[in-house]
């Protein structure tokens, strides 16, 4: 389990990723790690929402509640630090470069006031092999005043050599729609 006090800067994230790049493959599990995947969990307690960043998010994405509450999709933005720590940890088997965000599911369980302090956690849930490489699911959770207020699952793809070469890519350039997916669910 990894605990962080604050999110690392973008520069620090990139420098750490560059240092680890030679030892980590894309889209393949190293033979010695295939059966010894360690659990990864990162927590970041006491996160305050930056009002300037929240206002920028609202300007770009809009806010259905008139700006009084945190928009349902915003908490994911707070997970840059915990997610970076997870994919840069020694236990994560793939290169952080080339990871592609392929799917997101979020659930707002109760309204989040912009002034509340959040406790964030993310953990590796599953790694599965697909024809395009390995998909990695991370579960994210934001607690406000000791109660779960928001959760989500992010799916990242580490493409294998075949997928990186463009084999199997759609000729018309259209991205396929994922049928039956409900990427957002609000209970409030």
Description of each model-found segment:
Residues 61, 86, 112, 118-120, ...:
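Generic alpha-helix signal with a bias toward terminal, lower-confidence helices
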């Amino acid at each position: 389990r990894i605990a962080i006090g604050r999110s690392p800067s973008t520069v620090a994230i990139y420098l750490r990723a560059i240092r680890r790049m030679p030892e980590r493959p894309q889209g393949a599990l190293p033979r010695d790690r295939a059966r010894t995947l360690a659990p990864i969990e990162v927590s970041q307690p006491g996160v305050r929402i930056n009002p300037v960043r929240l206002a920028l998010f609202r300007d770009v994405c809009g806010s259905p509640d008139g700006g009084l509450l945190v928009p349902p999709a915003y908490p994911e933005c707070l997970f840059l630090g915990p997610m970076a720590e997870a994919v840069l940890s020694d236990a994560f088997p793939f290169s952080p470069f080339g990871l592609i965000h392929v799917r997101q599911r979020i659930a707002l369980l109760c309204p989040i006031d912009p002034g509340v302090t959040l406790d964030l956690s993310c953990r590796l849930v599953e790694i599965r092999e697909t024809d395009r490489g390995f998909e990695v699911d991370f579960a994210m959770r934001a607690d406000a005043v000791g109660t779960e207020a928001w959760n989500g699952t992010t799916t990242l793809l580490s493409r294998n050599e075949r997928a990186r070469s463009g084999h199997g890519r759609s000729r018309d350039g259209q991205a396929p729609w994922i049928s039956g997916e409900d990427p957002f669910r609000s209970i409030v």
